[in-house]
Amino acid sequence: MTESHDTPITPDGEARPHRRIKSFVMRAGRMTEGQQRGLDQGGPLYILPLADSPVDYDQVFGRSAPRTLEIGFGMGHSLLEMAAAAPEQDFIGVEVHRPGVGALLNGVLTQGLKNLRVYDCDAIEVLNRCVADNSLDRLMLFFPDPWHKARHHKRRIVQLEFAELVRRKLKPGGVFHMATDWEPYAEYMLEVMSAAPGYRNRAADGTYVPRPEERPITKFERRGERLGHGVWDLKFEKVD
C-alpha cells in the first residue's frame, strides 16, 4: 500500500495537512504465549531501530553475506524457513503486525538462528532511512494486499515510484521477487514492472516465472492449490 498524494478536503473547502498512506494496514490480534516470548526475549536481540542514516548490516550481522529483505512477512513462516535453509545468507524482515513479529522471533529463538533481523515499522521508512543504495541482493514481496476495488488501486504498494525505490536499494543484478494469488493483481504488477526503468524480467516469455523452489509454500497457498487457485511469481532483475 503505497503513499497517496491526495489531499483531503474539509467540509468548509479547506485542505487538510497531507496524510501519507503507509505501506501497511494495522490489524489487531491477540498475542499467544509464544509470540509474547518472541517479543520479550527476542525483541531486544533482533528488532532493529529505525535509523536516520544507512545501516552497516555487515556490522549488524558480523559478516559480509548475501542479503535479502522481505516486506510484510505476516506470521513469518516462510521467512523463518528460508533463513534456516540458507545460514550462509542474511535476512531482514519488515512487519508491523505484532503477533507476526512475535511468532517469527519465537521461531528464531527456538531454532537459534543468527542470520535474521526484524524491523517492526513502515517498510517505506525502512528503505528510505535505513537501507543503503546498491546494498540488497534480493527484495521479496509476497502476497501483498491487492486492494481489489478500483478506487483503492492507488493504495497498492507496487507502483512506479516504489519500483524505483526498490531498484535503488538493489545491487546491480539484484532481484525484486513478487508473488500474488490474485491474477488481476499479478497482471497489474507485471504492467507496472515492465514499465519501470532499470529492470529486466527474468521470465523467459516476459510474463511470470515458475514457482521458485526457494520460496516456501504456505499453508494458505496449499489450501488454495487444493481449491484450484493459482499463484503468480514475478522476478525482475536490476540491470543498471
From Swiss-Prot:
Reactions mediated catalytically: guanosine(46) in tRNA + S-adenosyl-L-methionine = N(7)-methylguanosine(46) in tRNA + S-adenosyl-L-homocysteine
Q: Which Gene3D superfamilies match?
A: Vaccinia Virus protein VP39
EC number(s) from the headed UniProt entry: 2.1.1.33
Q: Which keywords label this protein?
A: Methyltransferase, S-adenosyl-L-methionine, Transferase, tRNA processing
Residue numbers spanned by region Disordered: 1-20
Which residues does S-adenosyl-L-methionine bind?
70, 95, 122, 145
User: Which residues participate directly in catalysis?
Assistant: 145
Annotated binding of substrate, by residue: 149, 181, 218-221
Q: Name one GO molecular function term.
A: tRNA (guanine(46)-N7)-methyltransferase activity
Cite the CDD domains for this sequence: AdoMet_MTases
A GO cellular component annotated for this chain's UniProt record is:
tRNA methyltransferase complex
Q: What Pfam families has UniProt attached to this entry?
A: Methyltransf_4
Q: In which pathway does it act?
A: tRNA modification; N(7)-methylguanine-tRNA biosynthesis
Q: Where are the transmembrane segments?
A: none
Alphabetical list of PANTHER family matching this protein: 3-DEOXY-D-MANNO-OCTULOSONIC-ACID TRANSFERASE/TRNA GUANINE-N 7 - -METHYLTRANSFERASE, PENTACOTRIPEPTIDE-REPEAT REGION OF PRORP DOMAIN-CONTAINING PROTEIN
Q: Cite the NCBIfam families for this sequence.
A: tRNA (guanosine(46)-N7)-methyltransferase TrmB (TIGR00091)
What family does the database annotate? Belongs to the class I-like SAM-binding methyltransferase superfamily. TrmB family.
Protein function: Catalyzes the formation of N(7)-methylguanine at position 46 (m7G46) in tRNA.
Please state what the protein is called.
tRNA (guanine-N(7)-)-methyltransferase
Gene (name only):
trmB
